[in-house]
Amino acid sequence: MNLPNKLTMLRVILVPVFMVFAACSRYGTADFNPTFALIAGIIFAVASFTDFLDGYLARKNNLVTDFGKFMDPLADKCLTTAAFIYMVACGICSPVVLAVILFREFAVAGVRMLAAETGTVIAANMWGKVKTVLQMLTVLFYYFAAALAGPTDVMAVGLITQLLCWLCGAATVLSGGIYLWQNRKLFMQAK
């Protein structure tokens, strides 16, 4: 396994570690622990950075693999979906946004499965990357702002995060629609 693929797998491994610290932060309760929120944010930042780094190293060193094309977007989905599930549980993100994100990810996974049947590997497109970056920035804003905000800033952090979540939902619909349209031939060829 090459280094970019190891970085992708590290991102997958960091997901449960991130979730433990996110849960221990207990956002939205009287027991909120900003230290755990900050640690969760740092872990998420490191995991997000591996997304940039693995792609950069793979392209720069000609280490692009089918495994990487498949696992990199899957690792992103694991990381961002886990974070959004927790934000919904805390009441920060609308369940509608999470449903849109999950629907898009399952639809894209279905297209990838259809493509695999024909021996085609579909790499992530630019719009999917924009969506992923926006989702990651939203999560990073939430954890760092929640950890660093004073008691009077909590409401503002929540409102800004909710707005960013809706923006993520819109970007998710756009990227999913473009992805499905670009790969519509696969539906026509499906048996």
PLM regions: where:
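Alpha-helical transmembrane bundles and membrane-interface segments of multipass inner-membrane proteins
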Residues: 1-191
